[in-house]
Amino acid sequence: MPTFGSAVSRKLLPVLLGVLVLAGPARARQTTEFAHVVARLSEPGGYFDSDNLVSNETSYLHVLPALRTLDLHGGAYVGVGPEQNFSYIAELKPAIAILIDIRRDNLLLHLLFKAMFEVSRNRMEFLCLLYGRPAPPVLARWSDSPLEDILTYLDITPGDSAIQSRNHSELMDRVTRFGVPINDSDRVTLRRFHDEFYAQGLEITFTSRGRPSRPGYPTERSLYLATDLEGHPGSYLSTEDRFRTVRDLQRRDKVVPVVGDLSGPTAMKAIGAYLKEAGLPVTALYVSNVEMYLFRQGSFPRFAENVRALPGAPNGVLIRSYFGRGMLWNGGGPVGASPLPQVQPGQLSAQQLQTFPAFLQLTQHPDSLSYFELLTNGVVELRQPPRPRRQRRRRVRQPA
């Protein structure tokens, strides 16, 4: 079963206790600072009609080759939603990641993920904690295993409710020590979220409240195994190195969940001020398809203003997604059904990259901008043209 520490001999116990005493105050200071940053950057939350435990974007990894071409890495990453952010973080390797969402539930989910990352020695232990499975006897043997083998282990290993309850209790003890205020209602929500992963396993999908589920939403399994446009796996669990990139940031309190509205009056501006103080430019801002909702409710101009408050890197980008061909919005009205750029066959969603300079140029007069115009101007080509083959010169034999 997953454990949070290894057995120690009695001879080593006094030494270990001494180390813990020395480490305790330092950890407490870090935790206090983590909670302080969460509070400083947050604003009152709002409502959205979904749990968003997992992403609904089948195309979320399609931007990875273009991110590599742009040579984006380091700086600060800002993103919305649940764990698809971890895959972007694994690719970009930022110094800090700030995860903003209008739903306080998203902050709670990320606190649970943080606890799991901090105690997990590898991907196998992380997934066993998430899905309530007993961990294999020798965890270290799984560190170099293909992700497919790890998922097969989860498939053939039944969940254990006693292990799930024990793990959740220990994880909640750690969540409490982060210093972010957690009330009884939050604890109920966290247990419900964790139990959803336990009950549905790798087949868990995005769910909405009050509207029918859209066919074709990806399962968590398919999101883990997704590939980029070049056919390469790219999720944060695809390799142990990518997992460790995220885990190490989590252990250093550098993945900060924040409650806030992208078009709100406080959180985005507070994030901008905090990153300016730290001297960290934003290399990537992931907004999912939130802009569509902002156009619908007339708050996109405030979002554009908030983006201007961020210290964007000169080659930094917005990462966005959009869904469907005929359900796009132009200030509240549907746009035509013609295919848009970056749509890939068989995909429920499409991803886009847009550089900060292009976005800022396009949104100089946001009140007169349509969602369709936003999606069709100044976007980065995701598919790089193939390099021409070098022709080999034929050697002509000289007559003897």
Region spans (language model):
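Conserved SAM-binding loop of SAM-dependent methyltransferases across substrates and taxa
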Residues: 84-92
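Conserved class I S-adenosyl-L-methionine
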Residues: 72-83
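Alpha-helical subdomain
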Residues: 201-397
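Class I S-adenosyl-L-methionine-dependent methyltransferase module
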Residues: 98-256, 365, 371, 375-388
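Conserved alpha-helix/loop element of class I SAM-dependent methyltransferases that forms part
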Residues: 54-72
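Bacterial N-terminal signal peptides that target proteins for export
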Residues: 1-14
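Boundary at the C-terminal end of the N-terminal hydrophobic targeting segment
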Residues: 26-28
